[in-house]
Amino acid sequence: MRRKPQPDDAMTIKAQKPAAIRVVMPFVFRHWLKQPVMTAVIAFGLLGATVADLFMPIYSGHLVDALTKGAQDASARHDALIAFAAIVALGFTSIVLRMVGLQAIVPFTLRIMSDVARDAFQRVQRFSTDWHANSFAGSTVRKVTRGMWALDLYNDTILLALLPSLAVLLGSMILLGLHWTSLGLVIAVGALIYVAMTVALSTRYIAPAARVSNAWDTKVGGTLADALTCNAVVKSFGAEAREDARLMRVINRWRRRVNRTWLRYNYTAAVQLSVLLCLRGSVIGGSLLLWMAGRASPGDVTYVLTSYYIIHAYLRDVGMHINNLQRSVNDMEELVEIHDEPLGIVDAADAQPIAITGGRIQFEDVTFHYGGHRVPLYDGLSIDIRAGERIGLVGRSGSGKTTFVKLVQRLYDVSGGRILIDGQDIARATQQSLRSQIAIVQQEPILFHRSLAENIAYGAPGASMAAIEQAARLANAHDFILRLPKGYGTLVGERGVKLSGGERQRVALARAFLADAPVLILDEATSSLDSESEALIQEAMERLMKGRTSIVIAHRLSTVRSLNRILVFDRGEIVEQGNHAALIARRDGIYRSLFERQAMEFARITAAE
């Protein structure tokens, strides 16, 4: 009875996609063609060894015929020695040629694995912000590593196993058919039935189940990464048991899918062995009939049986190889999808590096909407930010503040209009040159699990230690760094978890100081810090903004009083703008309403304390 997709199995849909082998094989062959010489050496070595194996049954039959004539027959002794020498020579040739192929396939496969992993990483790095927001990092890592090792299995299966096996099968059937057409025809028909049945079962019966189990394998990796990355939150709520249970729910679903896949492999193997048993009976029975009819000598029967057992072994292996091939294809499918995924933002063909000197930013009639949203967030937005001007962005959540700075960084492309920096359209500039001249301090700074010095110098990789320390001093970070056991060599943990929120903020500010970019984006995050850290960060922020075009996303309005101009966003429109004094004077203004609400909240909290 055919299994119905389970309602909670969101991954079942993957089984409905076109055959993965039609997508994966061209992908791998493209990488083979990048190493034509190595591909030729491998094919020559392995096929040459296979041809040597093909002729061994012939000389085995000659040896048996010579032995049956008796040792007294001089010609028989001569024939036996010739057959023996040929068998040894063929065996030696097979070993040498096979070693040539094996030695060549090691660097061949390693280079492809390296290229595939590098290319996948490069593409993932350049995918859109939305893609990363909607993807588990752990799942992506699992797709790449699983696909990379599946490529090793794929190469071994095709080049070391399947190609030689098919050559032996074809060659043996031809040679056998030249001696006895009837037996050759029986083996040929049986082999074709076996191979066709194996391919059909692998692609139509096993592959859909394997796709689903692979999707759940990826989900297990994502669930693990999600819980481990947020371990501090798990501990703070004492939720270890809850996360254990959540993982086990995913693992149980994964186990059911994998169990189904593995059972399908077993059922397929049972069918394969049954077909081989029928073929064996037909060949042995046919050989006996030929011998009983006097149409075959003992040597002929030996040749037939030796050839058949070689064919039998290779046929059995072909079944296993096809299953392995299908398994490797399924394991690579998600990796190939990464390579086929379109990049979110692509440089124009004639893109040139942008040169930002003053930092004037102009939005000219900009229209923008997210993804498939019909209603645009921005519809004809225009604003001119002067070089060196310090701008605050204020508004309710979802009003368009964060989108504004993402468009400045060109993390998204506008739907209409254009954005200019120093008179240059950023859509015509290379992304790398644009973003390298815009420093950003995020609300939740993200640090690499590397040393503090490496994190500070991330925007200026060639910076000297003296420059790194000076940037840390300007960010009020130098003193706390020196108190750490290894100072600037201290590893900060994944995403900087070894540091407090205020310390991470100051490291991020030091990174921005060292980058020394003409445009600065500050996602203000002092509201969640203690008063001492807030004062240190506020002082560093004021120092950092001097002489730079600065855009501050303000979450606490008290931090924007000193800015030149404040832009008040509401539903994608700039509804108010001016300095703090001008905006607070508007009785019915949104800015004044937000400011008074925050002031009342602050007073309530202070009174409660």
Q: What residue spans do the PLM features occupy?
A:
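An intracellular "coupling" helix at the cytosolic face of ABC transporter transmembrane type-1 domains
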Residues: F29, L33-P36, R126-A133, R146-N155, ...
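ABC-type nucleotide-binding domain
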Residues: I354-E609
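Pre-NBD coupling/linker segments of ABC/ABC-like ATPases
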Residues: G344-I356
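Membrane-integrated ABC transporters
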Residues: M1-D53, T68-I87, G101-I105, T109, ...
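Helix-loop-helix
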Residues: L175-I193, R264-E333
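Juxtamembrane helix-loop junctions of ABC transporter transmembrane domains
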Residues: A10-I21, F44, A52-D65, L90-A137, ...
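Transmembrane helices of ABC transporter permease
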Residues: K34, M38-V51, T157-V212, V283-S297
